[in-house]
């Protein structure tokens, strides 16, 4: 081999070896998938606002994370613990007037109502259950099992 060809070959090998770690490192970079964790948007109804959801793990995580930001959270499940949707909900104020009426499209409802005492009635499969909640500082959770 001619000396100039050997020099060229050696330069190419040394250059490739110098760049190889960068190439391997660039190929092994893992970019995590971005999963949206946004709860559905609020709806108006009666004297308050609400949002129901929690179907699917991403939405459930987002809804549970948002519970602390709302005066009232409603959870619906079967006695076995399986999540439940299509629950008819009526919230009445201390005077017995309907403050909010909705049908949940998921096992979690986040409710924004003014401070006060409310009776929450939830109905599923012909069974109606009720709980009294007092809203003020902090957030409250009413858990309904059917």
Model-derived regions, located:
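Short beta-strand segments within Ig-like beta-sandwich modules, predominantly Fibronectin type-III
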Residues: 99-104, 133-134
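Primarily secretory-pathway and cell-envelope proteins
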Residues: 25-87, 124-146
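Short amphipathic beta-strand segments in non-cytosolic proteins
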Residues: 88-99
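A short tyrosine-centered beta-strand micro-motif
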Residues: 116-122
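Hydrophobic loop/turn residues within beta-sheet-rich immunoglobulin-like superfamily modules
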Residues: 113-116, 136
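Bacterial N-terminal signal peptides
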Residues: 11-20
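Short, surface-exposed beta-strand/beta-hairpin micro-motifs centered on an aromatic residue
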Residues: 106-112
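Bacterial N-terminal signal peptides that target proteins for export
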Residues: 2-12
